[in-house]
Design a protein with these regions (language model features):
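Short, small-residue-biased leader/transition segments that mark boundaries at the very start
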Residues: 1-3
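Short gly/pro/ser/thr-enriched loop/turn and capping motifs at secondary-structure boundaries
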Residues: 94-98
């Protein structure tokens, strides 16, 4: 705000990060309801002042990607998103109030964040979504149902978000497929990504200098295994 006062329209992000402590121990409580309210208030302040706003949410106190992790991330990120924040930091992968992160959490949180973004998008009301012509075609001239209509097939892709890991099978199919829980599926998916995705973000010469200096164990490609450097 001080920068905007001196230089109107200067690029800036309003990024306040007030944190909550559990008064019984003094430990940070990033997944608390109080933390969610504080971050939502910061987002609303940013909207009031007309500033692009970034807040922190998704900072569960749980040390594992368990039920506590899910419900704390769910309500903190959802409240922040619906309060009008433009950016939400720490929203994926974080555990133990920012003292750790977890590959399984990243892929679980990807599902969660997609669903939350869908709720922020809300219900679109326009000529296409009201579909009066489609109703007339189906109800007065057609089969009386929408199952095979081209608009139904189209809106299946635009209106619905399908989770990558979340289970929506019926009970019998779930049992037949091994009765896995989301942590097990997330572990397999995280390993699959790590073993098959090799982004090229570093100049090869710089990467070689880093590998010569440190015992890097990460593969650079699906067929190359890097052995630790022997000192």
């Amino acid at each position: 705000m001080c920068i905007r006062d001196r230089v109107p329209r200067a690029p800036a992000i309003f990024g306040t990060w007030p944190f909550v402590s559990d008064l019984r121990t003094g430990a940070m409580s990033g997944g608390s309801g109080e933390q969610a309210v504080l971050m939502a208030a910061c987002a609303q302040m940013g909207r009031y002042y007309g500033l692009p706003t970034g807040i922190a949410a998704g900072m569960t106190d749980s040390k594992l990607p368990d039920a506590q992790s899910g419900y704390e991330k769910g309500y903190t990120v959802t409240l922040g998103a619906h309060s009008g924040a433009n950016l939400i930091y720490e929203s994926a992968g974080m555990q133990a109030s920012l003292l750790g992160c977890c590959p399984e959490s990243y892929v679980i949180d990807n599902d969660m964040l997609g669903a939350i973004n869908r709720t922020v998008r809300g219900i679109e009301v326009n000529e296409d979504t009201m579909a009066f012509e489609t109703m007339q075609q189906v109800c007065t001239e057609g089969p009386g149902h929408y199952l095979g209509h081209e608009q139904t097939l189209s809106r299946m892709q635009s209106d619905y978000l399908y989770p990558e890991l979340g289970d929506r099978e019926n009970i019998n199919n779930w049992i037949d497929q091994g009765s896995s829980n989301i942590e097990e599926r997330a572990s397999l998916r995280a390993r699959e990504i790590i073993e098959s995705h090799f982004p090229d973000h570093i100049d090869p010469e710089i990467e070689m200098r880093i590998r010569n200096e440190f015992p890097v164990r990460i593969q650079t490609g699906p067929s190359q295994t890097i052995e630790p450097r022997v000192a």
